[in-house]
Structure formats: C-alpha cells, structure tokens
C-alpha cells in the first residue's frame, strides 16, 4: 500500500516549528540595487505563496464566503476553493513582478473552465502584481527575498 505524500509549505513549517526559514525573514537590503546572489531572488513558488496570502487576506476575507481548500503548488489548479451563497468557486492565482503583469492564456482558461464544469463550480482567476517598495528595485523588476513590497490586485474575474 502506497501513501500519498503530505505536502507542507515552507511557511507552515516556519510557523509551526522552532526551525526558522531564513527565506521568510525580513532582510534589510538598504536603498537601491544591492549585491545579491541568484538564490536571493524569489522563486515562482514563493511568489505564488505571497499571492495566495494576498487573495486570502485582502480579497476573500472581505467576501462572505467559506474557504474550503488552498493549494500553493504552482502547477496546481485550483489554488483556492471557496463557497459563497451555496455556489462552489475554484480560483487560479497568477502573480507577476512589475513591470510584468501576469496573464492567462486562452488554453489555460479553457482548461480551468472545463475542470470547474465537472464540479459545477464557478471558475475565477486572480491577477496580482507585486513590486519592491524601493524605487530602483521596482524599476528593475527585482523581487528579493525578505524585501518590502507593494502589491496590486489587478483583477479577479469569473470566467464562466
């Protein structure tokens, strides 16, 4: 008998153990573009984790809805499942670092809608842009681990 792996996010490990994740600590990068390594740049998983938190804290918390599940895997769909007025919703979260704005292709939209239809769920996509609070890093589109950020929820749209 094989068991499915239980996945736990870095953030959850950080919150529930004494092992503190250095990538989740606030860092003082100073002003301007500092010396940094490739490992200091946020990876796709960290950007999505940030985006899911933004949607949960700044969008869904203001809706009268019930959170059913969240999935912070970059290849996964949906990232967030919630219920509102007895209707099931499945949401995909896209995050980009300015000046790039995240987009969703027609093929992706068709796949998400098809999947949602199997569950009689509404399909929702959320587009979020983040940028460093430092002007030079913002202009460079640089997302460093532990930096301060500004965010914008570009859109949350229902596809079906």
Can you say where each PLM-predicted feature lies in the sequence?
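Acidic-basic catalytic patches of nuclease active cores, encompassing PD-(D/E)XK
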Residues: 2-71
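Generic detector of bulky aromatic hydrophobic side chains
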Residues: 32-36, 80, 90, 117
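Catalytic centers of nucleases
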Residues: 66-94, 98
């Amino acid at each position: 008998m094989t068991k499915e792996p239980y996945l736990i996010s870095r953030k959850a490990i950080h919150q529930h153990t004494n092992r503190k994740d250095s990538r989740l600590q606030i860092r003082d990068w100073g002003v301007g573009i500092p010396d940094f390594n490739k490992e200091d740049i946020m990876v796709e998983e960290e950007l999505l984790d940030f985006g899911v938190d933004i949607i949960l804290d700044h969008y869904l918390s203001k809706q009268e809805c019930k959170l059913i599940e969240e999935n912070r895997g970059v290849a996964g769909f949906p990232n967030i499942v919630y219920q509102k007025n007895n209707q099931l919703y499945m949401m995909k979260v896209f995050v980009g670092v300015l000046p790039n704005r995240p987009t969703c292709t027609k093929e992706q939209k068709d796949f998400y809608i098809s999947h949602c239809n199997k569950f009689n769920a509404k399909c929702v996509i959320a587009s979020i842009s983040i940028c460093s609070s430092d002007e030079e890093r913002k202009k460079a589109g640089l997302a460093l681990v532990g930096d301060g950020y500004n965010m914008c929820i570009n859109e949350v749209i229902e596809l079906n």
